[in-house]
Design a protein with these regions (language model features):
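N-terminal intrinsically disordered/low-complexity leader segments
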Residues: 1-17
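Hydrophobic alpha-helical bundle segments that form small-molecule/ligand-binding pockets
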Residues: 122-126, 135-163, 200-201
Length: 201
């Protein structure tokens, strides 16, 4: 985030709620329509705010897009950390991501991954934020995998960080195939096959 944004006065509770609503609505619109297909006017209408409010929180579209990237990454990581820290965390994680893919047929792709093709080559700041989001996501998966190592359910010679990156790459590739083919089968097959291979001792 740029210095101008970070140096702004602290938001009031009401202001924070308004800003959060703008970001949530922007995230939904961008996931549905893409970055190029979403205007500040679209977001203003969806969030039910005035033009002056919109400009107060987000003077330009780049700042809003960056906030959406942070929001999507944080939402994904928080949700998955909660599941991975539960009993049978990895199994619960597997069920969660596959259920979501079946429900949506991967329409729109991954909330974070779908932004890569739109922004990574043209916007260095956005690319850095997306990369940071994936790093946090991989770390959350790695933390969840460590319980399997502790229980002896994964070979000791497999590094949890490496396996987390592999799972994340498999997840993203599986979502892409499911999106193209219009069904969740490729996604489910990819995740289940990798988990089965990783658990072999």
């Amino acid at each position: 985030m740029n210095n101008e944004t970070s140096n702004r006065p602290r938001l009031t509770a009401k202001g924070a709620r308004t800003r959060a609503r703008i970001v949530e609505e922007a995230a939904a619109l961008i996931h549905e329509r893409g970055v190029a297909g979403t205007t500040l006017e679209d977001v203003k209408v969806a969030a039910e705010v005035s033009g002056s409010q919109m400009y107060h929180y987000f003077p330009d579209k780049n700042e809003l897009v960056q906030a959406v990237i942070d929001y999507q990454a944080e939402s994904i990581v928080n949700r998955q950390r909660q599941v991975l820290s539960s009993a049978n965390g990895v199994e619960a994680w597997r069920n969660m991501v596959i259920t979501a893919a079946k429900r949506t047929k991967a329409k729109g792709g991954c909330q974070l991954g779908s932004l890569v093709g739109q922004l990574a080559e043209s916007d260095p700041e956005a690319r850095a934020l997306i990369a940071a989001g994936f790093d946090k996501w991989a770390a959350a998966i790695s933390d969840g995998l460590r319980s399997l190592y502790a229980d002896g359910k994964l070979p000791s010679d497999i590094d949890p960080d490496d396996l987390a990156i592999t799972l994340l790459a498999t997840l993203e590739g599986g979502i892409l195939l499911a999106q193209v083919l219009g069904n969740s089968r490729p996604f489910e097959t990819a995740i289940d096959t990798l988990l089965a291979l990783a658990s072999q001792t």
